[in-house]
């Protein structure tokens, strides 16, 4: 099973949707861009199209000419990136067995990290065995958005959620049998990290693109950081 432990005292680098600030997201080109600048894992989204084909995209509106199928993406990592961690984020439900079997068929189980914001999906993947499993907290960034007219209410809700996140992490890990909590950077705190570590689980912060945020979550003790621009690691955590 893939390790999510820090290396050389720094969090692991996870390229978000490849490296979304450097190349088109969720594409083979994006995966190559992430590898070129240096990452420990590459993250990509998986959805089911209306024809039931599993493809690499965040949503149906994002499917285009460059969108690889899940099979094409897994073949890329099996052939062109034989030592890289593969972070598969499930945006659809109900195809867990098919996805895990495909990961297994390409010989990627030992370096796969499969995540979802859906409790049932994470629990199902964990029950299937093999791949490391993470539960995303919260399920979508819109749950904690501070934009628009509702910003004052969102901010108060965010503060409340940040306070209770340390108490939520343990039960979510227990219910899902996940071994990692994938926590939005705004909810990361030393208390949340300690709560996960007490259960033997890693903490992955998402999505961090600013050096000051990277420094903050690293200081909080997270084990890995998801970023659209992996280059920020070199400038922020060089020492």
What are these regions (language model features)?
Residues 1-239:
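Phosphate-group recognition and catalysis centered on beta-loop-alpha active-site segments
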């Amino acid at each position: 099973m893939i390790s999510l432990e820090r290396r050389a005292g720094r969090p692991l680098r996870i390229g978000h949707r490849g490296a979304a600030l450097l190349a088109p997201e969720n594409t083979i080109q994006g995966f190559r861009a992430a590898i070129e600048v240096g990452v420990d894992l590459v993250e990509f989204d998986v959805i089911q199209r209306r024809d039931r084909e599993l493809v690499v995209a965040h949503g149906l509106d994002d499917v285009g000419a460059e969108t690889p199928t899940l099979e094409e993406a897994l073949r890329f990592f099996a052939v062109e990136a034989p030592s890289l961690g593969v972070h598969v984020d499930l945006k659809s439900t109900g195809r867990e067995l098919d996805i895990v079997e495909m990961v297994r068929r390409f010989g990627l189980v030992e370096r796969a990290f499969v995540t979802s914001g859906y409790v049932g999906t994470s629990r199902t993947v964990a029950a299937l065995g093999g791949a490391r499993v993470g539960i995303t907290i919260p399920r979508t960034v819109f749950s904690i958005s501070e934009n628009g007219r509702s910003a004052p209410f969102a901010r108060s809700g965010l503060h409340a959620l940040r306070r209770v996140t340390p108490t939520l992490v343990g039960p979510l890990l227990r219910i899902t049998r996940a071994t990692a909590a994938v926590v939005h950077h705004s909810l990361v705190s030393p208390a949340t990290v300690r709560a996960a570590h007490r259960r033997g689980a890693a903490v992955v912060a998402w999505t961090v693109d600013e050096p000051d945020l990277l420094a903050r979550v690293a200081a909080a003790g997270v084990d890995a950081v998801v970023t659209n621009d992996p280059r920020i690691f070199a400038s922020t955590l060089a020492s």
